[in-house]
Amino acid sequence: LRPAVIRPKGK
């Protein structure tokens, strides 16, 4: 899983 998945920008 990519690190971006841990902090999703899509609220």
Curated annotation (Swiss-Prot):
Keywords for the protein's UniProt record, in alphabetical order: Amidation, Secreted
Tissues in which the protein is found: Expressed by the skin glands.
Q: Which residues carry this modification: Lysine amide?
A: 11
Q: What's the family?
A: Belongs to the frog skin active peptide (FSAP) family. Hyposin subfamily.
Task: Give the subcellular location.
Answer: Secreted
Keyword hit for Repressor: no
For this protein's source organism, the top of the classification is: Eukaryota, Metazoa, Chordata, Craniata, Vertebrata
State the name under which the record lists this protein.
Hyposin-H1
GO CC terms, sorted:
extracellular region
